[in-house]
Each structure stands twice: as structure tokens, then as C-alpha cells.
Amino acid sequence: MPSYIRDHRKRLRERFMTGGAAALPDYELLELVLFRSIPRQDVKPLARLLLDTFGDFNRVLTAPVERLAEVKGVGEAVITDLKILEASAHRMARARVMQRQVISSWDALLDYCHTTMAHRETEQFRVFYLDRKNVLIADEEQARGTVDHVPVYPREVAKRALELNASALILVHNHPSGDPTPSQSDIDMTARIRSACEALGLTLHDHLIIGKSVELSFRAEGYL
């Protein structure tokens, strides 16, 4: 490895350890990740290329494997390390909300939703199942869809609640466009799930739509 690359890596690591992530712009933080994947090359051009391609650090981590593989210079090692980092972030955020009362950890729940869903390029539909004390007992992905639609089956959602011995649930899905405004199909689907829940004595607390940097609550906006 050329000495200038070795010295640059050393300085960057020292800045990170001294000032934390806040001391580094996105491309330098991404460089730190790439140091492990590509141990003997200058990774700054690749870091900048990834950011130019996907937009920001979060979108690089959450980019589909197929799209990452299309970027020149990205191999299996890079993809693996990026996806390990993404999975770690998801797991940390999830740990803050599982087996906890939703009301007391609402901000953490929203953070988890944004971490796992805000930067997806296609729609994903999740259900949070709660017990009688409103403790989150299960977080399950029900369906994945296209850029503007995800198929959801109300009876399956309600049936799964009974299997888990849940008493209430919260629906969550993302809008890849970044705008969390509900479509008419979102409203209609929520109404069908609410009816299925009521028929079984279940409570639908809310339906959250996750945008790029903001969420919409059906309950707060009067849709429920």
C-alpha cells in the first residue's frame, strides 16, 4: 500500500475516534467502511461514486444488492460490509422498541420505522402486534410491493394477531416517493383491516406512512 494511502487512513481513523461520526462528512464515513472491504486501494473515488449514485449515506446502505453490484468498483466484499452495517443499524433500532410499551417508546418506534423503511425504493408493509398492556410483542413484514403499491390481505393480518395472542396492532408502510400523504387505496385498505380487526375484538391503534424524513399518522390526521 502506498504511504500516502496508509497515512490518509490513519488520519481519518484518528479523526473518527476523536470527534466521532459528526466530525466526518458522508464520503469520509463511507471511506472508513470501505477500508475493510478494499484494504490496499484509495477508496475515496468509490465513496464519492456511491454517494453520487444513491444520494446520501443512508441510501447507500439501504440500496438493493442488485443496484450496488452495478456500480463500478463494488464487489462482493463491499456489498457484504454495507449490508452488515445496515443490518446492525436495524437490529439496534429494533432492540429499543421490542418488548416495550409503545406509548413510552413512541419516538424510538418512529426512529425504527425510519431506519428500516424510509430509504427503500419499493413499498414495504409491516405490522406491529401489541399485547393487552400495549407492549410490542412482534414486528413482522407482511408484504413487499412496487414503487407505489403493496398487496395486503386484511384477513391474514387479523389472523396473525390471533396466532400471536395480540390485542392490538399498528400498521406501517413506506412511500418511496418521500411524500407520506395517503392514497385512496391506503385509506380503503386501512378501513378493511380495521373492520377485520373489530370483528375479532382487536384494536387498530394507528397506521403510519413513512416518508423520506417525515411520517403521517392516520390517527393524528383523523383517518382513524
Swiss-Prot record:
Residues 102-224 form the MPN domain. Gene3D superfamilies: 5' to 3' exonuclease, C-terminal subdomain (1.10.150.20), Cytidine Deaminase, domain 2 (3.40.140.10). Zn(2+) binds at residues 173, 175, 186. GO terms for molecular function: metal ion binding; metallopeptidase activity. The keyword Ligase does not apply. A motif (JAMM motif) lies at residues 173-186. Keywords: Hydrolase, Metal-binding, Metalloprotease, Protease, Zinc. Belongs to the UPF0758 family. This is UPF0758 protein SPO0054.
